[in-house]
């Protein structure tokens, strides 16, 4: 697959989020939002969540195999700490994707025939 054909769900989310209707309190109004936008948001969020989880798993496996290098000091402790913080943020981003996709799916279940949960 060429780079131009690789799905880029984070870019899709950034382009779609401004199209989400918000209420007077600044909260998303999924029922008032366009169903096409909601379906696209859900699809992008779900794909991004899967990509993040697979990436987190891969980095975790690499760290597990690199434990000897960490023990003997071949890897700087700051590097390991930075990876830990990165993994924490990626995990939070994956959870946020699920939290975004779920109400999008609920609001469009009658349109798509696909419910959530």
Predicted feature residues:
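Sequence/structural signature of long amphipathic alpha-helices
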Residues: 1-117
């Amino acid at each position: 697959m060429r780079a131009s054909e690789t799905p880029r769900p984070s870019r899709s989310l950034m382009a779609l989020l401004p199209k989400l209707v918000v209420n007077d309190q600044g909260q998303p109004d999924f029922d008032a939002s366009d169903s096409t936008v909601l379906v696209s948001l859900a699809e992008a969020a779900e794909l991004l969540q899967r990509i993040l989880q697979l990436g987190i798993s891969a980095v975790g496996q690499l760290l597990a195999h690199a434990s000897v290098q960490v023990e003997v000091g071949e890897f700087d402790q700051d590097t390991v700490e930075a990876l830990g913080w990165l993994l924490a943020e990626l995990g939070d981003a994956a959870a946020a994707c699920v939290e975004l996709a779920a109400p999008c799916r609920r609001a469009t279940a009658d349109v798509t025939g696909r419910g959530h949960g």
